[in-house]
């Protein structure tokens, strides 16, 4: 049974069809796997190598894939239903098959491993553009380009030279052959048309404003992809410095207050999201850190929420700020930690773990120890609050116990015992 390649189109006479995926589960236990029986036929209908959609399934499912090209067996580890894979295939088709302009599946991929770019051209509407290379499958495509793909300008130049050589051979006339007769006087021969002119025509033939704008957009997209690839090849230190310059520029331009989403997006692009708080503390904090925690809470929360690694970097960033403004901040450590804790930027577990070991990676060993000594009152308060909460839970459990009274039982004499134990609540402002 066939289905529409673009399943969002419900027209039964839609010309682009593909066979429905057939999945077969094999094996047991840890060796269970799903074999896509007709992957070759499906890939042929999409004009893509069968390894691409199979690898796409692996990326989306977080599963390993196996390719047995000789026997046409394409395998995804684990047990997966055919309907689930069919729905997942729609995502692959949308990202890597359909034209963004006309939504027809008549596209070819043009992979350039040297420049780390993947181009996309449509034979239906003439669209030409660059694919977004953020998806994990793009790494696989760059390493395994399709057979019909251009692998860079070197290949084109080589083909161009070969064509020129063949043209010269075909155009040369040997002495043994008789030259062709000249055309009649009243017949005009067409002007010579070389291969070089044909190759140059497709760039300059359309001079309308819209065509020029489209070409410029393609160039800018191409440049963005190249920049992204170059940045990800840099070291972690270099990428963190790029993020630092980005945040610093936003502050200098006076738009830092509304740039929290852009900063997180840039950190994710550079793959240094966990280290974002370390950069933010350096740019945004000074001796007025307590007021600044409230002001930039949203910025830090985008990094630190449910991210313990980012919270640890925030604490290391705090150490760096204290090192720069030691005279003003060293005595305020407990208050600063309390502000961060109340703002939901730090969790108890992370703070306690940080306090147990001094590190000399960001500040001197002596200063790191002194900071933790100054933080002890707050750490003690945290631990006692945690013990009280756990004790309260035990009391709640005791209250839920059902007591059965007996009329025949003797009632013991109850003596009232005065408790000298008083709850000593710690006032954090008095620390």
UniProtKB/Swiss-Prot annotation:
Residues 233-392 form the W2 domain. Pfam families: eIF-5_eIF-2B, W2. SUPFAM superfamilies: ARM repeat, Translation initiation factor 2 beta, aIF2beta, N-terminal domain, Zinc-binding domain of translation initiation factor 2 beta. Keywords: Cytoplasm, GTP-binding, GTPase activation, Initiation factor, Isopeptide bond, Nucleotide-binding, Phosphoprotein, Protein biosynthesis, Ubl conjugation. The modification Phosphoserine is found at residues 10, 229, 389-390, 410, 419. Residues 178-193 have a biased composition (Pro residues). The record marks 15 as: Arginine finger. Its main location: cytoplasm. It comes from the Eukaryota. The keyword Nucleotide-binding applies. One of its GO terms (biological process) is regulation of translational initiation. The modification Phosphothreonine is found at residue 227. Residues 153-170 have a biased composition (Basic and acidic residues). CDD domains: W2_eIF5 (cd11561). One of its GO terms (cellular component) is synapse. GTP binds at residues 27-34. Residues 143-216 are annotated as: Disordered. Residues 196-209 have a biased composition (Acidic residues). InterPro entries: ARM-type_fold (IPR016024), IF2/IF5 (IPR045196), Transl_init_fac_IF2/IF5_dom (IPR002735), Transl_init_fac_IF2/IF5_N (IPR016189), Transl_init_fac_IF2/IF5_Zn-bd (IPR016190), W2_domain (IPR003307). GO terms for molecular function: eukaryotic initiation factor eIF2 binding; GDP-dissociation inhibitor activity; GTP binding; GTPase activator activity; translation initiation factor activity. It is found in: Cytoplasm. There is a cross-link at residues 413, 418 (Glycyl lysine isopeptide (Lys-Gly) (interchain with G-Cter in SUMO2)). Belongs to the eIF-2-beta/eIF-5 family. Component of the 43S pre-initiation complex (43S PIC), which binds to the mRNA cap-proximal region, scans mRNA 5'-untranslated region, and locates the initiation codon. In this complex, acts as a GTPase-activating protein, by promoting GTP hydrolysis by eIF2G (EIF2S3). During scanning, interacts with both EIF1 (via its C-terminal domain (CTD)) and EIF1A (via its NTD). This interaction with EIF1A contributes to the maintenance of EIF1 within the open 43S PIC. When start codon is recognized, EIF5, via its NTD, induces eIF2G (EIF2S3) to hydrolyze the GTP. Component of the 43S pre-initiation complex (43S PIC), which is composed of the 40S ribosomal subunit, EIF1, eIF1A (EIF1AX), eIF3 complex, EIF5 and eIF2-GTP-initiator tRNA complex (eIF2 ternary complex). Interacts with eIF1A (EIF1AX) during scanning. Interacts through its C-terminal domain (CTD) with EIF1 or with eIF2-beta (EIF2S2) (mutually exclusive) through a common binding site. Interacts through its C-terminal domain (CTD) with the CTD of EIF5B. Interacts with FMR1 isoform 6; this interaction occurs in a RNA-dependent manner. This is Eukaryotic translation initiation factor 5. It comes from Pongo abelii (Sumatran orangutan).
């Amino acid at each position: 049974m066939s289905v529409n390649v673009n399943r969002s189109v419900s027209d039964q006479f839609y010309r682009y069809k593909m066979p429905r995926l057939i999945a077969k589960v094999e094996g047991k236990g840890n060796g269970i796997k799903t074999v896509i029986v007709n992957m070759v036929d499906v890939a042929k209908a999409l004009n893509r190598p069968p390894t691409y959609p199979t690898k796409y399934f692996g990326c989306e499912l977080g599963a390993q894939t196996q390719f047995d090209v000789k026997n046409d067996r394409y395998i995804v580890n684990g047990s997966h239903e055919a309907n689930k894979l069919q729905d997942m295939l729609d995502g692959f088709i949308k990202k890597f098959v359909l034209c963004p302009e006309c939504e027809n599946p008549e596209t070819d991929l043009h992979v350039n491993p040297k420049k780390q770019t993947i181009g996309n051209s449509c034979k239906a509407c003439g669209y030409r553009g660059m694919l977004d290379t953020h998806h994990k499958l793009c790494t696989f495509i760059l390493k395994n380009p399709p057979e019909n793909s251009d692998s860079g300008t070197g290949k084109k130049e080589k083909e161009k030279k070969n064509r020129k050589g063949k043209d010269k051979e075909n155009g040369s006339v040997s002495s043994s052959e008789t030259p062709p007769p000249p055309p009649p006087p009243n017949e005009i021969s067409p002007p010579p048309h070389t291969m070089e002119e044909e190759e140059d025509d497709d760039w300059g033939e359309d001079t309308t404003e819209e065509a020029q704008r489209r070409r410029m957009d393609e160039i800018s997209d191409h440049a963005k992809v190249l920049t992204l690839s170059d940045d990800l090849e840099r070291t972690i230190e270099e990428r963190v410095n790029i993020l630092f310059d980005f945040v610093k520029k936003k502050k200098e331009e006076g738009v830092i207050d509304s740039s929290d989403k852009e900063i997180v997006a840039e950190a994710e692009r550079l793959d240094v999201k966990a280290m974002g708080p370390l950069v933010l503390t350096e740019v945004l904090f000074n001796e007025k850190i307590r007021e600044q925690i409230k002001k930039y809470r949203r910025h830090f929360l985008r990094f630190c929420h449910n991210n313990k690694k980012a919270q640890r970097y925030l604490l290391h960033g705090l150490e760096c700020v204290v090192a720069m403004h030691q005279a003003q901040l060293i005595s305020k450590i407990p208050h600063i930690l309390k502000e961060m804790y109340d703002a939901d930027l730090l969790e108890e577990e992370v703070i306690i773990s940080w306090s147990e070991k001094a590190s000399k990676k960001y500040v001197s060993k002596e200063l790191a120890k002194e900071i933790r000594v100054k933080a002890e009152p707050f750490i003690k308060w945290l631990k006692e609050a945690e013990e009280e909460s756990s004790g309260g839970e035990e009391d709640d459990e005791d209250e839920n116990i059902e007591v059965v009274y007996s009329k025949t039982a003797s009632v013991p004499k109850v003596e009232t015992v005065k408790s000298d134990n008083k709850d000593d609540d710690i006032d954090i402002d008095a620390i």
